[in-house]
């Protein structure tokens, strides 16, 4: 047995982990069973029991079109090599679940024409993977099932060479961060992701980022999905770029922050100064995660939710419809108050909390939060729209007098 080991960062199991239930970044939607026009109807009453038993031994394929069935049957009938048949079955299906659209980690070139992965890329990804039994395992870590599965489902990591010119790296402007939310459905796959995009970072374009993003998810060369994600990111950037670049004077708002990850519902209630640049949402999220002992997945989730809330406050402030709850300042001579003592509940409202909730309870909390925000917006419109209503009534009165 050889003592060679896999180099550091040679294999990646990202595509395997994102399809698990704990990381629902790329989920597979089960297609609904329905009659398709043009589908071939099979009358099983014509077969005897023995024929049905023989028929059940053959592998099943998609019956989206007659040509695909004939091509699959002719390929399997003309090739008696079991290894070749196994490779053909892998290229035709996605983990034994039928043909996919390039959204699986084991998707081959595909005889259905749905995957755009070339034969050369497929060969490079299938060759060069070290054997599991030839690894030097001095710590005996391969005996654990999770580690063995991670090694077996690993694929060769593709290094991305990103050249940043010196003038771009040294002359960067102040970061304008925009929270991006992706909820894209393509075929049988649904991408649900959230990240932050810096508008002033010109070292990489949206198109190049989406290309790398699709390659990491195993969606190689999917042109329609690539354009769909690019358009979604560009729309959100155009919508929020002007709001994110606003410079707001000294303004303190009360933030009711919520974040849900892996069935854990995080909620916090605190005061935030929009003009203070010493504390960013990313630093705040890291402090919260460290203090509460949360998983690392909460750090980008909390930062993204805080960015969304602050942009919502900026937009209302620019439109003149900001209605925020303020903390009464009980200090004398207009100075800022220090630590407030609440004898009733000891400030439990201002403490972060984490709850284990079901999916129905999480959706109920989110609906209640959106309902409260709409109620506050209606109240602010009612308070700020009195002059407009009075003018409209005066115009109606003048029109009535003229008539």
From Swiss-Prot:
The keyword Transcription applies. Its main location: nucleus. GO terms for molecular function: nucleosome binding. GO terms for cellular component: nuclear chromosome; RSC-type complex. It is found in: Nucleus. GO terms for biological process: chromatin remodeling at centromere; chromosome segregation; double-strand break repair; G2/M transition of mitotic cell cycle; nucleosome disassembly; regulation of nuclear cell cycle DNA replication; transcription elongation by RNA polymerase II. Residues 95-105 have a biased composition (Gly residues). It comes from the Eukaryota. Residues 84-94 have a biased composition (Low complexity). Belongs to the SNF5 family. Part of the chromatin structure-remodeling complex (RSC) which is involved in transcription regulation and nucleosome positioning. RSC is responsible for the transfer of a histone octamer from a nucleosome core particle to naked DNA. The reaction requires ATP and involves an activated RSC-nucleosome intermediate. Remodeling reaction also involves DNA translocation, DNA twist and conformational change. The keyword Ribonucleoprotein does not apply. Residues 58-115 are annotated as: Disordered. This is Chromatin structure-remodeling complex subunit SFH1. Keywords: Cell cycle, Chromatin regulator, Nucleus, Transcription, Transcription regulation. Residues 63-72 have a biased composition (Acidic residues). Transmembrane segments: none annotated.
């Amino acid at each position: 047995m050889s003592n060679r080991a896999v180099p550091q960062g040679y294999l990646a199991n990202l595509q395997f982990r994102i399809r698990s239930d704990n990381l629902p970044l790329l989920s597979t939607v089960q297609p609904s069973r329905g009659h398709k026009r043009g589908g071939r109807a099979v009358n099983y009453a014509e077969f005897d029991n023995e024929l049905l038993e023989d028929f059940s031994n053959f592998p099943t394929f998609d019956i989206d079109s007659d040509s695909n069935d004939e091509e699959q049957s002719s390929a399997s009938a003309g090739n008696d090599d079991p290894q070749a048949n196994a490779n053909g079955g892998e290229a035709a299906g996605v983990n034994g679940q039928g043909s996919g659209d390039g959204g699986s980690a084991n998707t081959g070139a595909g005889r259905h024409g749905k995957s755009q992965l070339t034969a050369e890329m497929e060969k490079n990804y299938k060759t060069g993977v070290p054997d599991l039994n030839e690894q030097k395992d001095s710590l005996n870590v391969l005996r654990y099932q999770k580690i063995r599965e991670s090694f077996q489902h690993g694929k060769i990591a593709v290094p991305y060479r990103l050249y940043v010119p010196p003038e771009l790296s040294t002359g960067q402007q102040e970061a304008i961060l925009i929270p991006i939310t992706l909820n894209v459905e393509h075929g049988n796959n649904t991408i649900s992701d959230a990240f932050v995009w810096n508008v002033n970072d010109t070292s990489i374009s949206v198109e190049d980022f989406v290309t790398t993003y699709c390659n990491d998810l195993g969606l190689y060369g999917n042109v329609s999905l690539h354009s769909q994600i690019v358009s979604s990111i560009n729309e959100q950037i155009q919508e929020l770029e002007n709001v994110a670049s606003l410079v707001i004077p000294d303004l303190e708002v009360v933030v009711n922050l919520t974040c849900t990850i892996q069935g854990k519902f995080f909620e916090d209630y605190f005061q935030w100064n929009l003009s203070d640049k010493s504390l960013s949402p990313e630093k705040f999220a890291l402090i919260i995660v460290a203090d509460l002992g949360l998983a690392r997945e909460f750090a980008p989730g909390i930062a993204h939710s805080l960015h969304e809330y602050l942009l919502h406050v900026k937009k209302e402030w620019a439109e003149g419809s900001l209605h925020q709850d303020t903390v009464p300042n009980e200090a004398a001579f207009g100075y800022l108050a220090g630590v407030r003592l609440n004898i009733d509940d000891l400030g439990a409202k201002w403490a972060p909390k984490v709850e284990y909730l079901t999916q129905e309870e999480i959706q109920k909390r989110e609906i209640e939060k959106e309902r409260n925000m709409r109620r506050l917006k209606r109240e602010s419109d009612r308070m700020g729209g009195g002059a407009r209503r009075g003018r409209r009534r005066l115009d109606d009165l003048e029109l009535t007098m003229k008539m």
